[in-house]
Each structure stands twice: as structure tokens, then as C-alpha cells.
Amino acid sequence: MAGATVTVEEVRKAQRATGPATVLAIGTATPANCVHQADYPDYYFRITKSEHMTDLKEKFKRMCDKSQIRKRYMHLTEEYLAENPNMCAYMAPSLDARQDIVVVEVPKLGKAAAQKAIKEWGQPKSKITHLVFCTTSGVDMPGADYQLTKMLGLRPSVNRLMMYQQGCFAGGTVLRVAKDLAENNRGARVLVVCSEITAVTFRGPSESHLDSMVGQALFGDGAAAVIVGADPDKRVECPLFQLVSASQTILPDSEGAIDGHLREVGLTFHLLKDVPGLISKNIERSLEEAFKPLGITDYNSIFWVAHPGGPAILDQVEAKVGLKKERMRATRHVLSEYGNMSSACVLFILDEMRKRSAEEGQATTGEGFDWGVLFGFGPGLTVETVVLHSVPITIAAITA
């Protein structure tokens, strides 16, 4: 019997990519139903039959006014909510009705974003080797990853990973996972999809649960998809951002700061007041660990993609690090135009940044800067930190 002619080390070397994981395309999608923030308090208290709670409505109006959100997109329409009054109550059994929506609509919205990313990528979908799907909106088996594989007509042998109930930091998580997949599997092309629908969290107001109302004032629906791969074929692929490093950490003394619990009443949301303070207090440590090896200490010399959990988080991070207002421009634009879409937000911000950089004639996809940071913040408190490197803007990037 002949023995092996190669070593394990040789096999491993052949399996690994040569260069870093790279974002090759981005696509986004929202439901058709658009809700303007200025009109939302009246709509919300009317549809939940809570107009008698006048003081609470005034509080909610102030929350919406301070949110820095102009509009959001929501799958839930007034007609659907009228047919499902338990979803409008504060704590009525309603999980079945919520699940019936998100199990169908989460992969469907993800498909719309994925199709845009695949079209921009310009390669046959048969070249997709891996699928990473992330949502905090409902749970099912087989999962949304399976449903999307069927919807898109991906190969049955595509390697799938389904990530449920991660929360708002997960836009960073999926990039970290995609980076590892792309760099450890030569030739891999990873389709990453984050799809979020607030049907699982929508509920009426309560005097005893004001942090739930914060969520009602902030959250919106959206899906984003990216194609990630290493060693791009420059003849047919157009790199956008390189994923240089990625890490995750739990912030000290932050247990219980952000919690979500899936119960018979849906997904309940709990938030401590000092979340912005906890994040800003620890942000410099994350930046130092990520950028000290690169010799970067001026955080105004990099581009920023930060999960817009709310304006207070962005304000306090800016103040703590001494950021110029324009560093968070793309982040604040996405917050204003879409609200907090949980895991999908940072991918929307990447899309906004590369498009605006091209439109303004910047030298790189990162607002003219070479290096950048992407932050995900969420339950735990968990922080994802991804170091990015932009690429020079080409004609292909401008016309994408």
C-alpha cells in the first residue's frame, strides 16, 4: 500500500489564501413601507390604542425628536397590526403571529439584498462557497440560511452558518467569521447576509418599561449583504475594503446593560441608561489594541463605521476620542435615513461610505483615508472591532 505523498503542512498551505479577506460587493434592501419619524408618535399611540396615555405620548415624542432619525422602513403595516391586536398590546401572547411573519420575510428581505450584491460582484452564483446568515428576528429550523440557499438557487453543497439572536454587534461578527472563512479556504467566496425585521419586537407602550419605548423609537427594518473573498481576480472582481483584523470583547462591569429575551410576548428589550457611557469609557482600549500595532494613534486619520445604536452613543464616543464631526458622517446618515437596523447597520454604512467617497472624488473607498475601523456594539455588552483598509477608487467602483 502506497503511503501519502504530501504532508499535513503542505495540505494546509495549499488550503490557505495568500492575501487578506476583501469585501467585493455590497447590496442593501428595505421593506417598501416607509415611516417618517415626525409622524410616528401619533401613529404608534393610535395603532396601539394608547392615545389616553397623554403624558407617556409626550415622553415618546421627545424620544423620537432626540433620535436624529428622519425615517425608517417597517414591514409591519397598519392593516396587519389591525388584524393582530395582540402585537399592539404591551405584553399579550403573540409569538406565533410574529414568527409567522419573520420566518417568511427575513429570508425574503435577505434575498433582495443578496441579489444586489451578487449582481454587483458580477460572478456566477455557483462560485459562492459559503453562506453566513445573521438575524435577531425570530428562529426556525431549517433556518433562514437554508431558505435563502433555496431562494437564490445556490449549490446544495454551499457551506452554511446560521447565526440567530446575536443582536446589534453582529454586523462585526459576520465580517470576522467571513474573514476567517475566506482566508482559510483558498478560492472561497462568502455570501454574508444580515436581515432584520422589527415584527418580533413591536409592542405597545408601558409606563413601567420605558427602555422598551426607546427601542420603539429607534429600530427599523433592513437587510444587507456582502461578498467576501481573498485574492480577488482583478479582471472580474472589484475590491472595496480589506478586512485586516477582527476581534470581540465583553466590556467590564456591563452585564445586563443590554438584554433581549424571546418569550411568548415576542422579543423583549431591556436597556440600562448608561450604555453610552460604558461604550465610550472602553472605546479607547479597543482602538489602542487594534491600531497600536499599525503605529496609528490619531483616530481622526482613519475612517469610521460605528453601529448607530442611538445618537447618545455616537455623541459620547466622539467626545471621548476627540473625533471631528465628519468622521461619523456616514454613520449618522444611515441612522437618519434608516434608524437602528441591528446587525445590518454597519454594512449599510460601508455601502454609504464607498458610494459617497466615489461621488465626492475621494482617492479611496474610505473617504480618502487608507485605514479605518468598524465597531459593532450590542448585548453583553459585546464589542466587535474590525480593522479595515480601503482601496483606491477606480472607474469600476464609481459605476457600481
UniProtKB/Swiss-Prot annotation:
CDD domains: CHS_like. Disulfide bonds: none annotated. The active site is at residue 168. One of its GO terms (molecular function) is naringenin-chalcone synthase activity. GO terms for biological process: flavonoid biosynthetic process. The keyword Transferase applies. It comes from the Eukaryota. It catalyses: (E)-4-coumaroyl-CoA + 3 malonyl-CoA + 3 H(+) = 2',4,4',6'-tetrahydroxychalcone + 3 CO2 + 4 CoA. Keywords: Acyltransferase, Flavonoid biosynthesis, Transferase. Pathway: Secondary metabolite biosynthesis; flavonoid biosynthesis. Gene3D superfamilies: 3.40.47.10. InterPro entries: Chalcone/stilbene_synt_C (IPR012328), Chalcone/stilbene_synt_N (IPR001099), Chalcone/stilbene_synthase_AS (IPR018088), Polyketide_synthase_type-III (IPR011141), Thiolase-like (IPR016039). The primary product of this enzyme is 4,2',4',6'-tetrahydroxychalcone (also termed naringenin-chalcone or chalcone) which can under specific conditions spontaneously isomerize into naringenin. Belongs to the thiolase-like superfamily. Chalcone/stilbene synthases family. This is Chalcone synthase 7. It comes from Sorghum bicolor (Sorghum).
